[in-house]
Regions:
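Short basic helix-loop element that most often maps to the first helix and adjoining turn
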Residues: 56-71
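C-terminal, charged low-complexity interaction regions
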Residues: 140-153
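Extended, acidic-biased charged interface segments
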Residues: 100-110
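Short alpha-helical "recognition helix" segments of helix-turn-helix
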Residues: 68-76, 83
């Protein structure tokens, strides 16, 4: 078995799905379907009965949700420094532990509003200039966001 320690994880072991090879620099490890492995680990973390450690919380955020500390903070209604502190000290508040699990599970299981909210936060972080374009259709106003350079005037 291979002890998988990516992202500071200490309790993950791979029974298979990896190859150890010798390189000029020592042993190297390659993983089959790394995205699937990451998803599987994150789902296991959302289902575990004990509280998340700081490393587990960080793994769900960074490898699973692919968001920064400030982005997760925005989703949770707090500042990014709080997220950083929890990850460093392993003192994740119970409410944040549960919310991170729910956000990840909803995003990966295709909960459209959650997935869109996470994607919006990630997009905002990339500082894309956008315009809000509002169209009236059948008496209802419908907003949409468009990249500034794609909007026709």
């Amino acid at each position: 078995m291979y002890h998988y320690t990516d992202g500071g994880l200490r309790n993950v072991w791979l029974a298979n799905g990896y190859e150890i090879t010798q390189t000029p620099y020592g042993e190297g490890v390659s993983f089959h379907n790394l995205d699937g492995l990451t998803r599987s680990i994150c789902m296991a973390l959302t289902r575990k009965s004990s509280p998340l450690t700081g490393a587990e919380f960080r793994y769900i955020r960074s490898a699973g949700m692919l968001v920064s500390q400030p982005a997760l903070g925005k989703l949770m209604g707090i500042d990014g420094q709080s997220v950083a502190r929890w990850e460093k000290t392993s003192k994740v508040p119970l409410w944040a532990d549960k919310l991170a699990r729910l956000l990840y599970a909803a995003q990966v299981n295709g909960d459209e509003p959650i997935a869109k909210a996470v994607e919006r936060i990630k997009t905002v972080e990339r500082l894309i200039k956008q315009k809000i374009v509002v169209r009236e259709s059948r008496g209802q106003w419908r907003p949409s966001l468009q990249d500034d350079d794609l909007v026709t005037h």
